[in-house]
Amino acid sequence: AAREIAKQIGIPYYVFDCSKEYEKIVLENFKEEYLSGRTPNPCIRCNSMIKFDVLPYLAKKAGLEFDKFATGHYANIEYDAEKARYILKKGINSKKDQSYFLYKLKQKQLENIILPLGKYEKSEIRKIAKENGLAVYDKPDSQDFYNGDYNELLEVKSKKGNIVDISGNILG
């Protein structure tokens, strides 16, 4: 879909293979945290370490020049001149706000990012896409960081056994 949109609006489309970094930084960490009994949020790690760090680095390394890096996150970034720092703010659409997923971004990252969707409701974006003939106007929302089988990712094998309560009583 992204390739089609880029062609449709007349901008270059590039692909960078970040799969090794994603495997090491996001998936391995997710697996370690999950199997240690914690509930990781891989999107936060992916945003701060892959999307806004590895990806811009690879683009610049490939000779692409850009002042700002734009994504489709529903959040806003404002510059506070008094404090001389960038502030991450919620998007206006409280149901689709994604500022939480970006909270680990550093000042240098925030300085180089544009989040054009943060000032719109999702329905407005879909309407704009439809009016401009973009095929993604009715595309379902993406929700997951991994499109495979979680058991395979976590290397969890089902085991036969009794179902027990917290006191150790066999329930079935």
Which residues does each predicted region cover?
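ATP-dependent adenylation/nucleotidyltransferase module used to activate substrates
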Residues: 1-103, 124
